[in-house]
Amino acid sequence: MESKDHNGLRSKVEFIIEFEEGKLFRDLIDAIKQINDRGWFKFNKSGFGYSQYSEENKIWIDITINGSGLKYEFKCNDPDYAVELEIKSIKNNLSQVSAKDGIKIYKLLNEQNIYFQRTSKLVNVSKSVCCMAIPNVVKEHQEYNPPEYAEGEDKPTITVGSIEFKKELSSIIKTGSQINEIHITKNSVTFAGANQEKTSTAVAQFDANPGIKISGLERYSPVISKKEFNISIEVSKKVLKYFSKISTLTKSNGIKLFVQENLPLKIVSNFGTHGTIKSYIDIGQN
């Protein structure tokens, strides 16, 4: 790690991004690093995207951010720019960013380093410039193409308030659960946690009504019929923590869960007012 003072910055950058809401970006990094320490950022003139697949947790994260409103500026000869970064290192560099700070992210021409600069709105607060080496720069990487969901009643959509979503998942995490599962039926998604002895259990059920009810794990029994389906997948506590943290980014827009038989569980949330965060959990039918 080193500090530098880049005078005349804009005349020699390959790309630059400015965030007025630095804490929002910090919270985004904090969420996605729960799943994996590495992922792909793609930058272009209209905004930026991020994608990450965790083989261990069987979850894909796909983020699309509109650059408008972010003081976003892109400068590069290539129409797209892809960089593999260590998310854990980014998080460490952003730990001091507060709600009143902004962030600049940029890369200088002919350098293999990316820089994160804290830009504070407070008087007499120094601006820190942190240098982090990029493991590698790539032009291409494999995209994830999730299957399309059918229209109509075969595509149940469950909308949950972000505050309720965070509250109920947090209750499961706090049980110290060692067994975590997601149960899916045509009209509901249930997150459940229990310890090995099942002496401590917690369940958060989100219905298509919509609605929420908490009960003991042993009392949850999905109805199975020709018109219903029952899918169950074990997930790690990292996955639960990830969803708990992204709920803080949605503000008043809520979280949407898309449920369809034989397809990944699709969970859509927002990055403030600037873009969407799509998460796909690979599921196996019982």
Describe the residue ranges of each PLM region:
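DNA polymerase sliding clamps and clamp-related checkpoint/processivity subunits
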Residues: 1-33, 38-175, 181-286
